[in-house]
């Protein structure tokens, strides 16, 4: 726990989803001064950006920025390509078509740059190794490798102000994440998890993200108040 009179800055990657919102709440509970960062990268679920903006206001982040980048032209992902359908949930060990190449590397790089501007040595990201659909950039080994790179590649790093990338959800399943968030007062109806939510944030109910969310609430024995299309 940090001294409330001397808050330490942290950049929080905030998508507007369940995991990133819980991560922001955890950072706030640890008394970090939070700066939230979201991305408009051409994703189909544009409503999650509105969720991110609303959540940043509710948690009173010191600043919330939305960075506009285009990954649709260089990415063959169902999340960014209108010609590729988001598939229904399926149990598979293969990396799914919803994987966006290098997405977390790009997002963390922006967070790293902003953290240097803010003279900040802490970044929070809501990845986890259990309910992550097989994405390679959600693993602890990847995060550690990025952290090493960041401290070799930045002015702060070589001057001894070492960056720490916090992954408070890394070993939690969805039910544990939900329980943690509820204990911190999160209203999960404000979050958007679905890969193809409509403009009002209503979830499809059949994609991987929706199924993991449904299962999480079921296992947590908490009513799921998410608005689903099906």
Curated annotation (Swiss-Prot):
GO terms assigned for molecular function: ATP binding; ligase activity, forming carbon-nitrogen bonds; zinc ion binding
Quote the record's binding site residues for ATP: 14-24
Q: What does this protein do?
A: Catalyzes the ATP-dependent conversion of 7-carboxy-7-deazaguanine (CDG) to 7-cyano-7-deazaguanine (preQ(0)).
Q: In which pathway does it act?
A: Purine metabolism; 7-cyano-7-deazaguanine biosynthesis
Q: Which family does it belong to?
A: Belongs to the QueC family.
**PANTHER family per the record?**
7-CYANO-7-DEAZAGUANINE SYNTHASE (PTHR42914:SF1)
Reply yes or no: does the keyword Electron transport apply: no
Q: Name the gene for this chain.
A: queC
Pfam families the record matches = QueC
Provide the binding site for Zn(2+): 194, 204, 207, 210
InterPro entries per the UniProt record, alphabetical: QueC, Rossmann-like_a/b/a_fold
State the needed cofactors, names only.
Zn(2+)
EC number from the UniProt entry:
6.3.4.20
Keywords associated with the record: ATP-binding, Ligase, Metal-binding, Nucleotide-binding, Queuosine biosynthesis, Zinc
What is catalyzed by this enzyme? 7-carboxy-7-deazaguanine + NH4(+) + ATP = 7-cyano-7-deazaguanine + ADP + phosphate + H2O + H(+)
Paste the cofactor note: Binds 1 zinc ion per subunit.
Organism, by scientific name, is Vesicomyosocius okutanii subsp. Calyptogena okutanii (strain HA)
Know the name of this protein?
Answer: 7-cyano-7-deazaguanine synthase
Q: Which GO terms describe its biological process?
A: queuosine biosynthetic process
């Amino acid at each position: 726990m940090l001294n409330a009179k001397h808050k330490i800055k942290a950049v929080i990657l905030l998508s507007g989803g369940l995991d990133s919102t819980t991560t922001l709440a955890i950072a706030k509970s640890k008394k970090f001064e939070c700066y939230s960062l979201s991305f408009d990268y051409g994703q189909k679920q544009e409503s999650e950006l509105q969720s991110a903006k609303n959540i940043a206001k509710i948690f009173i982040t010191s600043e919330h920025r939305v960075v506009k980048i285009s990954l649709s032209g260089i990415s063959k992902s169902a999340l960014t390509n209108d010609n590729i359908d988001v598939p229904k949930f399926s149990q598979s060990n293969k990396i799914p078509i919803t994987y966006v190449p290098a997405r977390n590397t790009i997002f963390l790089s922006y967070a790293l740059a902003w953290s240097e501007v803010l003279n900040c040595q802490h970044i929070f990201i809501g990845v986890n190794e259990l309910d992550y659909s097989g994405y390679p950039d959600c693993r602890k080994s990847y995060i550690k490798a990025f952290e090493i790179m960041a401290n070799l590649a930045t002015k702060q790093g070589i001057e001894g102000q070492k960056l720490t990338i916090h992954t408070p959800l890394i070993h939690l399943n969805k039910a544990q994440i939900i329980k943690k968030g509820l204990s911190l007062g999160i209203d999960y109806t404000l979050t958007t998890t679905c890969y193809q939510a409509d403009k009002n944030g209503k979830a499809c109910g059949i994609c991987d993200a929706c199924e993991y969310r449904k299962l999480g609430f079921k296992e947590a024995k908490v009513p799921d108040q998410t608005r689903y299309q099906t």
